[in-house]
From Swiss-Prot:
Organism lineage: Eukaryota, Viridiplantae, Streptophyta, Embryophyta, Tracheophyta
Organism per entry: Fragaria ananassa (Strawberry)
Family to which this protein belongs: Belongs to the profilin family.
Main localisation: cytoplasm
Pfam families given in the database record: Profilin (PF00235)
Entries under CDD domains matching the protein: PROF
Complex formation: Occurs in many kinds of cells as a complex with monomeric actin in a 1:1 ratio.
Identification of the protein by name: Profilin
Subcellular location: Cytoplasm, Cytoskeleton
InterPro entries in UniProt: PFN (IPR048278), PFN_euk (IPR005455), PFN_sf (IPR036140), Profilin_CS (IPR027310)
Length: 131
């Protein structure tokens, strides 16, 4: 299965009538493996900040999580495994796997819990597969 199929079929899937606004699977070096058409262009320093927060949980909290220049307030995640961010009625979930970062961006009417479920479910599966 291609990385694009994972994005199209597993991250951009429908859940209770809602979809993520954008999603991507990127390497921990910042290389984009697959993304939805609506996913923002990431800056290298944004990816570096995310990876640093997984290695040293809490480093993004004071400055916020940036994706494509958009700032998200960091909210409670799972140190070393999941980073969650909020911006107005929407937000983001970032799940770290062995090799990659899965990023899901949502807006109303999707809920934070729905976004978390979609991103973390695929992330857990990829971790089980050694990816």
């Amino acid at each position: 299965m291609s990385w694009q199929t994972y994005v199209d079929d597993h991250l951009m899937c429908e859940i209770e009538g809602n979809h993520l606004s954008a999603a991507a699977i990127i390497g921990q070096d910042g290389s984009v493996w697959a993304q939805s058409a609506t996913f923002p262009q990431l800056k290298p320093e944004e990816v570096t900040g995310i990876v640093r927060d997984f290695d040293e949980p809490g480093t993004l909290a004071p400055t916020g999580l940036y994706l494509g220049g958009t700032k998200y307030m960091v909210i409670q995640g799972e140190p070393g495994a999941v980073i969650r961010g909020k911006k107005g009625p929407g937000g983001v979930t970032v799940k770290k796997t062995t090799l990659a970062l899965l990023i899901g961006i949502y807006d109303e009417p999707m809920t934070p819990g729905q976004c978390n479920m979609i991103v973390e479910r695929l992330g857990d599966y990829l971790v089980e597969q050694g990816l």
